[in-house]
């Protein structure tokens, strides 16, 4: 059996779709996934980011300050549980009939980043 781990998901929200995306996540996707058993431990939104060079100097990479990034974290007890929950959520009629297409209208699916991470012993999130 595998160890518990976290999944960090990063999405780029389309311009002029931020409010709609945030409401869709809050009122539809998050409650639906929690009902299916997903342990969602954090949801975040950012409109900018900074890159810091090796000498500690901030570089001006995102000059337009229009990054529109949505980040969320889910926890799984094992790889087996993750596979089971993915199936329950993403193969369900509710997802396929009412949510899947809507997601593609609001975020850039080609830019999705997903990290599977193990919590370190000194982390507050376990």
Model-derived regions: residue spans:
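Homeobox/homeodomain signature
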Residues: 1-3, 11-14, 28-30, 66, ...
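Glycine-rich beta-strand-turn "strand-cap" elements at beta-sheet edges
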Residues: 1-2, 39-65, 94-126
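Surface-exposed interaction/gating patches
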Residues: 1-24, 28-32, 121-126
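Glutamate identity and glutamate-enriched acidic tracts
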Residues: 7, 20-26, 47, 77-80, ...
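A short, structured loop/turn motif at beta-sheet edges
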Residues: 34-36, 77-80, 122
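Short, well-ordered beta-strand segments in beta-rich or mixed alpha/beta enzyme
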Residues: 6-12, 50-90, 115
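Short amphipathic alpha-helical segments
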Residues: 17-45, 90, 94, 98-99
């Amino acid at each position: 059996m595998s160890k518990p781990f976290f999944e960090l998901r990063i999405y780029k929200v389309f311009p002029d779709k931020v409010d709609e995306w945030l409401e869709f996540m809050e009122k539809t996707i998050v409650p639906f996934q929690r009902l299916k058993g997903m342990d969602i431990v954090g949801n975040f939104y950012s409109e900018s980011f900074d890159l810091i060079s090796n000498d500690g100097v901030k570089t001006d990479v995102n000059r337009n300050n229009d990054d529109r990034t949505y980040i969320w974290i889910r926890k799984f007890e094992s790889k087996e549980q993750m596979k089971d929950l993915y199936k329950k959520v993403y193969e369900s009629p509710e997802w396929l009939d009412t949510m899947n297409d809507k997601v593609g209208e609001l975020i850039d699916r080609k830019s999705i980043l997903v990290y599977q991470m193990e919590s370190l012993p000194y982390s507050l999130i376990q």
